[in-house]
């Protein structure tokens, strides 16, 4: 199957220029059409008024009952000679022409090709193509006339209730047609020039209008990894670009946060790994510096094994967090009773709690959730391990389970020294410690709470922490 070649969309400047120019040119042509149509209607009304005026004059002569036909025709010829660009034809009741304009063909011969005049408002008015003849023009000497506007009407004394004549009057409209054609040609020429000007003006206007976009683009191009704290000012751009600038600022803020976290993460993990590696090297060098007994070598190996185990756990935890960061942490959900899961975690920590003189207590109902049992037990284990680490001897750690508004909450409470408010938002950050100096006395690697948050988020839940004089409370909220 042959794929279609990639075709880049037209630029915004091209599209804007095309549509604005098209709209403007269309508006101009619409105006030109209205003008031409108005002129045509005006000329048609003017011609019809002239025809009615002529017909009224001739009708008075032909309707006179006391005149003979010869006398009527003589009077008719005298009147017609006073009109230029007008042809007359008079037919009797038998359809025979009794008079037509001297020196001109009989217009009745051309009436079979007559068509109704659509520009005439009311009345039976027709357009004729022919006869062709030279006649005086409007200030232009003689000109060829071949297009006529014609009316016909019954006139003359009544015989058997019907007029004895039918009068045909044709008025030349060639001057009007020439005027309209000249006007159309001038409008077309003007439209062509204006269209070209409009395209260039719109191109210039669009180029000027896109200046803020180019300005924003230059500002964005100047932002490097060292300038992630730079923000664009939405007040300095047009309102149409404000949302774009705000979105960019939000994006760069997220990038800065991720970049900062990654930098800190790299520094922290390098520091965390460097210390056990240094210990391994130091212990090994000391062991090799002189002859050692088997017991001393075994002690060194056990110490090295402890450091290696700690490093392996840290690497495993980091891989787990990397999966969470890449949305690859997919829980294998099944219906669980959280009371049972808490009991299993209690069984695991029971010996350690007794050794430290701390009591473990569960309070609550049998809360049902859909979740991954291994992940949830790991999250609970990390919270309980953290609570055991900071709970004074003789105190009690309480784990509560409750259902609130179709949500299940697991609360881990432990008494102890309260955590300062400024530290609470960062407790779930990797390698973050409230007291950085306490790194090696059983406090762990500093990523346990980060793992808790990743597991809870993977289950579409939330985790929060509060701390006061009564102790510290971690609250996991999961969908029921």
Swiss-Prot record:
<dbReference type="Pfam" id="PF00672">
    <property type="entry name" value="HAMP"/>
</dbReference>
<dbReference type="Pfam" id="PF21085">
    <property type="entry name" value="CusS"/>
</dbReference>
<dbReference type="InterPro" id="IPR005467">
    <property type="entry name" value="His_kinase_dom"/>
</dbReference>
<dbReference type="GO" id="GO:0004673">
    <property type="term" value="F:protein histidine kinase activity"/>
</dbReference>
<protein>
    <recommendedName>
        <fullName>Sensor histidine kinase CusS</fullName>
        <ecNumber>2.7.13.3</ecNumber>
    </recommendedName>
</protein>
<feature type="transmembrane region" description="Helical">
    <location>
        <begin position="16"/>
        <end position="36"/>
    </location>
</feature>
<dbReference type="InterPro" id="IPR003661">
    <property type="entry name" value="HisK_dim/P_dom"/>
</dbReference>
<dbReference type="GO" id="GO:0000160">
    <property type="term" value="P:phosphorelay signal transduction system"/>
</dbReference>
<feature type="domain" description="Histidine kinase">
    <location>
        <begin position="268"/>
        <end position="480"/>
    </location>
</feature>
<feature type="modified residue" description="Phosphohistidine; by autocatalysis">
    <location>
        <position position="271"/>
    </location>
</feature>
<dbReference type="GO" id="GO:0005886">
    <property type="term" value="C:plasma membrane"/>
</dbReference>
<dbReference type="InterPro" id="IPR003660">
    <property type="entry name" value="HAMP_dom"/>
</dbReference>
<dbReference type="GO" id="GO:0007165">
    <property type="term" value="P:signal transduction"/>
</dbReference>
<keyword id="KW-1003">Cell membrane</keyword>
<keyword id="KW-1133">Transmembrane helix</keyword>
<dbReference type="InterPro" id="IPR004358">
    <property type="entry name" value="Sig_transdc_His_kin-like_C"/>
</dbReference>
<keyword id="KW-0902">Two-component regulatory system</keyword>
<comment type="function">
    <text>Member of the two-component regulatory system CusS/CusR involved in response to copper and silver. Acts as a copper/silver ion sensor. Activates CusR by phosphorylation.</text>
</comment>
<dbReference type="GO" id="GO:0000155">
    <property type="term" value="F:phosphorelay sensor kinase activity"/>
</dbReference>
<dbReference type="Pfam" id="PF00512">
    <property type="entry name" value="HisKA"/>
</dbReference>
<keyword id="KW-0808">Transferase</keyword>
<dbReference type="GO" id="GO:0071292">
    <property type="term" value="P:cellular response to silver ion"/>
</dbReference>
<dbReference type="GO" id="GO:0016020">
    <property type="term" value="C:membrane"/>
</dbReference>
<dbReference type="Pfam" id="PF02518">
    <property type="entry name" value="HATPase_c"/>
</dbReference>
<dbReference type="InterPro" id="IPR036890">
    <property type="entry name" value="HATPase_C_sf"/>
</dbReference>
<dbReference type="InterPro" id="IPR006290">
    <property type="entry name" value="CztS_silS_copS"/>
</dbReference>
<dbReference type="GO" id="GO:0071280">
    <property type="term" value="P:cellular response to copper ion"/>
</dbReference>
<keyword id="KW-0418">Kinase</keyword>
<keyword id="KW-0547">Nucleotide-binding</keyword>
<keyword id="KW-0597">Phosphoprotein</keyword>
<feature type="topological domain" description="Periplasmic">
    <location>
        <begin position="37"/>
        <end position="186"/>
    </location>
</feature>
<keyword id="KW-0186">Copper</keyword>
<dbReference type="GO" id="GO:0005524">
    <property type="term" value="F:ATP binding"/>
</dbReference>
<feature type="topological domain" description="Cytoplasmic">
    <location>
        <begin position="1"/>
        <end position="15"/>
    </location>
</feature>
<dbReference type="InterPro" id="IPR036097">
    <property type="entry name" value="HisK_dim/P_sf"/>
</dbReference>
<dbReference type="GO" id="GO:0046872">
    <property type="term" value="F:metal ion binding"/>
</dbReference>
<dbReference type="InterPro" id="IPR050428">
    <property type="entry name" value="TCS_sensor_his_kinase"/>
</dbReference>
<keyword id="KW-0067">ATP-binding</keyword>
<keyword id="KW-0812">Transmembrane</keyword>
<feature type="domain" description="HAMP">
    <location>
        <begin position="208"/>
        <end position="260"/>
    </location>
</feature>
<dbReference type="InterPro" id="IPR048590">
    <property type="entry name" value="CusS-like_sensor"/>
</dbReference>
<keyword id="KW-0472">Membrane</keyword>
């Amino acid at each position: 199957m042959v794929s279609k070649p990639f075709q880049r969309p037209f630029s915004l400047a091209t599209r804007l220029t095309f549509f604005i120019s098209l709209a403007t040119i269309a508006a101009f042509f619409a105006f030109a059409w209205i003008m031409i149509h108005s002129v045509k209607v005006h000329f048609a009304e003017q011609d019809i008024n002239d025809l009615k005026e002529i017909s009224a004059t001739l009708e008075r002569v032909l309707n006179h009952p006391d005149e003979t036909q010869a006398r009527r025709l003589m009077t008719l010829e005298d009147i017609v000679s006073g009109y230029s660009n007008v042809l007359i034809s008079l037919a009797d009741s038998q359809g025979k022409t009794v008079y037509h304009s001297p020196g001109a063909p009989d217009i009745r011969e051309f009436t079979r090709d007559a068509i109704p005049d659509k520009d005439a408002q009311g009345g039976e008015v027709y357009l004729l193509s022919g006869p062709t003849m030279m006649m005086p023009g409007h200030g232009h000497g003689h000109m060829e006339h071949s297009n006529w506007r014609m009316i016909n009407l019954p006139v003359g004394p009544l015989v058997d209730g019907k007029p004895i004549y039918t009068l045909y009057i044709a008025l030349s409209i060639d001057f009007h047609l020439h005027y309209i054609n000249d006007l159309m040609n001038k409008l077309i020429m003007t439209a062509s020039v204006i269209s070209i000007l409009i395209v260039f003006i719109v191109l210039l206007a669009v180029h000027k209008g896109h200046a803020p976009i180019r300005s924003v683009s230059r500002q964005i191009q100047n932002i490097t990894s060292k300038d992630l704290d730079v923000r664009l000012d939405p007040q300095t751009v047009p309102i149409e670009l404000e949302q774009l600038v705000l979105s960019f600022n939000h994006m760069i803020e997220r990038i800065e946060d991720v970049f900062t976290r990654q930098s800190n993460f790299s520094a922290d993990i390098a520091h965390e790994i460097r210390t056990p590696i240094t210990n391994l090297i130091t212990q090994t060098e000391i062991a090799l510096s002189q002859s050692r007994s088997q017991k001393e070598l075994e002690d060194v190996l056990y110490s090295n094994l402890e450091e290696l185990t700690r490093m392996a756990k840290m690497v495993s935890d980091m891989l787990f967090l990397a999966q969470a960061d890449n949305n690859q942490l997919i829980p294998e959900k099944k219906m669980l009773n959280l009371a049972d899961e808490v009991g299993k975690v209690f069984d695991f920590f029971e010996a350690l709690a007794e050794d430290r003189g701390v009591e473990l207590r569960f309070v609550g109902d049998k809360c049902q959730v859909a979740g991954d049992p291994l992940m949830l037990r790991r999250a609970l284990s990390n919270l309980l391990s953290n609570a055991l680490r900071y709970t004074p001897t003789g105190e009690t750690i309480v784990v509560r389970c409750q259902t609130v508004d179709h949500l299940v909450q697991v609360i881990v409470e432990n008494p102890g020294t309260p955590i300062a408010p400024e530290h609470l938002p960062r407790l779930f950050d990797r390698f973050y410690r409230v007291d950085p100096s306490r790194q090696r006395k059983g406090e762990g690697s500093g990523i346990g709470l980060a793992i808790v948050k990743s597991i809870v988020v993977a289950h579409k839940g939330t985790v929060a922490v509060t701390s006061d004089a009564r102790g510290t409370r971690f609250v996991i909220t999961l969908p029921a």
